[in-house]
Amino acid sequence: MDIKLLPRRLSSDSENSLSISKETQSIRARRHNILVACFLLVVLSFVGISAFLFWTPYSESLRKSTPISHDNAIEGEEQLVEGILEPLALDPWDPQMSLNGLPTAHFRDNLKADVKYITSWPGAGWTNDVMTYANMIYLGFITDRIPVVPMFTPSHINIGATAPVPSLAFGEVFDLPRMRNLTGKAILEWRDVKDTESEAVDDIGCWNIWEAVQYREHYPRRSSAPEHLKLDISYTKAPAWVKLIPDFEHDPHATFWSLARLAFPQALHDNLVTPLPSPLHGTSLPPDTQMLCYDYMYYVCAQQPYEYDTDYSPAWRYVAQYMHWVPSIQNLANIYLNRAFGVPEDEPTPPYIAIHVRHYDFVDQCKVPIEECFATIPVIARRVREMQDQILEEKGIVVNHVIMTSDEKQETWWQEVADQNWSTPDHSRTKELYGDWYPVFIDAAIQSGGIGFVGTEGSTMSIMAKRRVEAWQGGITKMVKWGYVGADDH
């Protein structure tokens, strides 16, 4: 019997599997084709862009117009660089950004209509005036006003001078471009605003703070700065509430925020009294609303009198710590230090401890004989030895150099200093070479540059040196107490 083999019939499940397999292969084929097409497109795009970029005329232009990196740069005028016009990078804190232009004969002609300013005047010794200006600048920061800093006037420097000592611009002592960048704020000098050669007298109204916070002098605080600036001022007495301790005759401090109130329209409107006529023109003017000014701002604090030596002091934290010396003064200080230490002038200054002893006007505060009032050299030497040990322990630095700065005149006292093998800056020709201001500037820079500092309790010069050494050098500081025998025992 013949048997015929017939083709095997697939089940429906097998047919379905075969169909799915064919579809899968078709999908994979399409996906592969798409990927190949994408890859070819990318390659072609890359080739095209490369050809465009490296086409000589365009690539040269692109390279030439690459922006130049500049901190705090903003868009401004254009400059020509290798034939290509570029935006000129400007410093946003440059004085002319806050003014109409170069200094003018009348200060108002240089003020921008949409900008508000603040100023005040010096009225004491140089260090106190430094604090005064820092206070004024801080008040400008919290009232959104641009500080305009006057010059330093030689109220104390003139004493004993053989000829009149000229005033000196703030920016000749402190590095203002650096300060502006560190604070991120615009800070002007009066020489930026008004031409220093101008003989034009400007009328202005200012607040009289001094008469509101003390009860002995019944007039605004006196200063020679307005005369130098050719300003004729009409003063308005500030309200009594600006005083930190109401009706307390032994302290003349105002507070920052009470003075800040007077910078705004409501307090100005509510506290206007009849202004004093100006001394030259006899003009009576209310306090100026664009160039806000106060007669004297040394005695201003946030919370307590004489707070510069506190860790929270806002005038120090936000302003004064950024007031670094101009390079010329710092370089002079380094030269004087190296000479005193017997080190070549072109070598790095070795680590040192600076001392500041103030005697001159503190004599008036002594209630015992002078020889019992001030700390003796052995007492100061004890502080120095303790500081040397502390620096070695905490920083691993051996400090062999100690330098003394002081206003003391007695030769026997200076001989005691020499007997300690301490150095002193040689100021025998400083005034002749650099001017009457420079012994003070060089001493202050020396005091601020050490790894350690020993100062005089209550001296503003010592307080500022102490803060600078701590902030700038990470140094160790001590203040020597005085007033009676054993005052600094510890």
Features from the language model and the residues they span:
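Secretory-pathway glycan-assembly enzymes, especially type II membrane glycosyltransferases
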Residues: 74-374, 406
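Short helix-terminating capping/connector loops at secondary-structure junctions
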Residues: 345-350, 392-399, 473-480
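A donor-sugar binding/catalytic signature common to diverse glycosyltransferases
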Residues: 440-487
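Well-ordered, non-membrane alpha-helical segments in soluble/globular domains
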Residues: 370-390
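N-terminal signal-anchor transmembrane helix specifying type II single-pass membrane topology
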Residues: 2-68
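Catalytic donor nucleotide-activated moiety binding site of glycosyltransferases and closely related
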Residues: 388-433
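Short, aromatic/basic amphipathic alpha-helical patches
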Residues: 163-170, 411-422, 464, 468
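Amphipathic alpha-helical interaction motifs in eukaryotic regulatory proteins
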Residues: 134-137, 381, 385, 448, ...
